């Protein structure tokens, strides 16, 4: 939570501003984002609520495409000296933004410009640490943090003779359930997944406590060598490739496209961000939630944050920075965090909002909704599960996706795909140093 710092001069200025408020034009703050569907509706709702809560600043949300497209649009806008006030950057883009010293103003500094002091002890530690420098300085505001979970179609489970109240816990159990669902005709497809990079490699590493790369996956140093071709990865992706041969596993796309395969009833199981919940609920499907599957003897350890955070560029006016600070403070309020969490499935970033949600019996009334939080906070992180930080993670993800697509298309096996991904990824990381 943020504590307001009030000085005599600030109070005098506030009184003067109130008296002469009509003489000042409203400061508009463009918020570029990559949210669609129910999450886009939430962006618009929160912007409207903030705008109606005061008259000095106006948040103007602008959809700029999917997460990678939004990041690229923001970088291009900064280079042309026309950046938005606020840019939503997905987790993979954090390393890119952190490396752009001089191009961004840390969120903690923005808050200070607005008269607020950031108290990181009031936030979920894993989330704040992910978006902070080693010295603890918060670089971006964690707007929509998420954790990957398993969604499953209860009706399809019942038709296939599976227990609709007992989601599979391990990957072998998921694969067996997928085969039964496909063979029984309960659904045309047993299993799909969004974000093969974030969920099936980065979180796979953390949740199963195996290294993604050297140097603590990049958190202990930028000279990283990928290790995603070790035996457990090969076993996992070969199982997925085998299921893809007859359509038991169906590939939807590189980001969140596969969610449509689940909400349409095409596929009976989906690994997806907890932030995808809004669209799942909106679809009306009879769904259940389970924890992210793991391999016995390896997991479960802890998941790492996904979603996105809000970054602020350098070169804005003092009025803009003050307005952004007010907006960040607004977003940190418990009532706002509770609303965002309950409606969207994203995690409440403050401990106060989490406690308030628990006290309301929300989790008892909505089984599975606490799962993504417990996954992230359940165990102390290891060297393998603190996160992944590469200066060019979006580029490395593209390389992995190309190899996965060739594998799923039957052009190569999992070991070849992962060996190629490591070789190409390491070359790209070295070139970006």
From Swiss-Prot:
GO terms for cellular component: periplasmic space. Keywords: Periplasm, Signal, Transport. Disulfide bonds: none annotated. It is found in: Periplasm. Sn-glycerol 3-phosphate binds at residues 67, 91, 146, 273, 307, 346, 397. The complex is composed of two ATP-binding proteins (UgpC), two transmembrane proteins (UgpA and UgpE) and a solute-binding protein (UgpB). Part of the ABC transporter complex UgpBAEC involved in sn-glycerol-3-phosphate (G3P) import. Binds G3P. This is sn-glycerol-3-phosphate-binding periplasmic protein UgpB. It comes from Brucella melitensis biotype 1 (strain ATCC 23456 / CCUG 17765 / NCTC 10094 / 16M).
């Amino acid at each position: 939570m943020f504590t307001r710092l009030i000085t005599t001069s600030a109070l005098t200025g506030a009184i003067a501003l109130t008296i002469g408020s009509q003489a000042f034009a409203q400061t508009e703050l463009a918020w570029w984002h990559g949210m669609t569907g129910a999450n886009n509706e939430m962006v618009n709702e929160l912007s409207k609520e903030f705008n109606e809560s005061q008259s000095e600043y106006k948040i103007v949300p602008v959809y700029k495409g999917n997460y990678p497209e939004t990041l690229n649009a923001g970088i291009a806008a900064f280079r042309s000296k026309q950046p938005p006030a606020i840019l939503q950057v997905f987790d993979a883009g954090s390393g890119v933004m952190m490396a752009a010293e001089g191009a961004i103003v840390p969120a903690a500094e923005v808050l200070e410009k607005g008269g607020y002091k950031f108290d990181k002890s009031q936030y979920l530690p894993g989330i704040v640490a992910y978006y902070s420098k080693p010295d603890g300085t918060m670089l971006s505001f964690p707007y929509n943090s998420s954790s990957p979970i398993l969604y499953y179609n209860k009706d399809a489970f019942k038709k296939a003779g599976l227990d609709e109240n007992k989601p599979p816990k391990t990957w072998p159990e998921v694969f067996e359930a997928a085969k039964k669902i496909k063979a029984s005709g309960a659904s045309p497809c047993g299993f799909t997944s969004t974000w093969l990079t974030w969920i099936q490699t980065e979180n796979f590493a953390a949740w199963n406590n195996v290294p993604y790369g050297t140097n603590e996956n990049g958190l202990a140093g930028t000279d990283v060598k990928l290790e995603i071709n070790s035996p457990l990865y090969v076993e996992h992706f070969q199982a997925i490739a085998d299921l893809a041969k007859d359509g038991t596993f169906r590939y939807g796309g590189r980001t969140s496209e596969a969610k449509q395969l689940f909400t349409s009833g095409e596929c009976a199981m989906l690994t997806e961000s907890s932030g995808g919940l809004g669209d799942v609920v909106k679809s009306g499907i009879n769904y259940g939630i389970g924890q992210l599957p793991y391999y016995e003897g390896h997991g479960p350890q802890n998941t790492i944050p996904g979603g996105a955070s809000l970054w602020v560029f350098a070169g804005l006016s003092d009025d803009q920075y003050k307005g952004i600070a007010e907006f960040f403070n607004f977003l940190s309020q418990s009532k706002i965090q509770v609303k965002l969490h309950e409606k969207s499935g994203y995690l409440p970033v403050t401990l106060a909002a989490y406690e308030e949600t628990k006290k309301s019996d929300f989790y008892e009334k909505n089984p599975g909704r606490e799962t993504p939080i417990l996954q992230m906070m359940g165990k102390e992180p290891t060297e393998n599960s603190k996160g992944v930080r590469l200066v060019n993670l979006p580029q490395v993800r593209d390389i992995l996706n190309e190899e996965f697509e060739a594998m799923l298309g039957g052009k190569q096996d999992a070991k070849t795909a992962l060996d190629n991904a490591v070789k190409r990824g390491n070359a790209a990381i070295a070139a970006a140093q």
